[in-house]
């Protein structure tokens, strides 16, 4: 707070150290895999054909969504440095014929289009308010008419005082990122509304650690 800048830098996929990068990705995969087992079975994607897993890293969610929806294919969009590890995980899952990987930076580059589902899991908290709004706008623009956009985040109460885990995670983003933060339901809904989306609501799922899906 005194310096108005992060006090430390998190491990990330954008590092030249291959071992550090794969360690980070494996950690993210293990977390995402455990979360996906709880959330994906309760999300109805029947009739949907092509999912964008934005910032999907190793494709853990794409893998689970495809397993639960036999007619679904998916594209994971993440940094090019993620590709080798992601493609190995996807191949090991037996999904290489249904899940592809596109390398790029969703904060600075346009996204491919033609999707009828976009899945944004735990990527907005690493970005500031304006950047998060722009990410949601890009994701919405990648959808065909009638497309569905889903955002999974640690969601703060509207007064920002809780629940405990999203509030503590908000502090973690303060010390670890330039502008990252946890967001409230109203803020996430605002991003979606300003991106031209309709029928915005939080799904009635009981997920751990204050996690929610819009």
Located regions from the model:
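Conserved Class I S-adenosyl-L-methionine-dependent methyltransferase catalytic core
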Residues: 1-49
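Alpha-helical subdomain
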Residues: 45, 50-214
């Amino acid at each position: 707070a005194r310096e108005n800048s992060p006090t430390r830098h998190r491990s990330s996929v954008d590092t030249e150290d291959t071992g550090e990068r794969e360690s980070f990705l494996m950690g993210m995969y293990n977390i995402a895999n455990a979360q996906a087992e709880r959330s994906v079975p309760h999300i109805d994607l029947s009739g949907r054909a092509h999912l964008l897993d934005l910032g999907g890293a190793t494709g853990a969610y794409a893998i689970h969504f495809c397993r639960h929806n036999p007619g679904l294919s998916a594209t994971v969009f993440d940094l090019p440095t993620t590709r080798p590890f992601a493609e190995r995980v996807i191949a090991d899952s037996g999904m290489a014929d249904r899940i592809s990987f596109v390398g790029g930076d969703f904060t600075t580059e346009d996204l491919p289009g033609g999707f009828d589902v976009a899945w944004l899991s735990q990527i907005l908290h690493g970005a500031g308010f304006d950047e998060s709004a722009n990410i949601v706008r890009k994701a919405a623009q990648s959808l065909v008419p009638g497309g569905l956009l889903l955002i999974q985040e640690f969601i703060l109460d509207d007064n920002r005082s809780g629940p405990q885990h999203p509030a503590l995670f908000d502090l973690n983003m303060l010390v670890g990122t330039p502008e990252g933060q946890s967001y409230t339901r109203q803020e996430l809904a605002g991003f979606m509304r300003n991106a031209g989306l309709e029928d915005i609501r939080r799904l009635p799922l009981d997920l751990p650690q204050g996690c929610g899906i819009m």
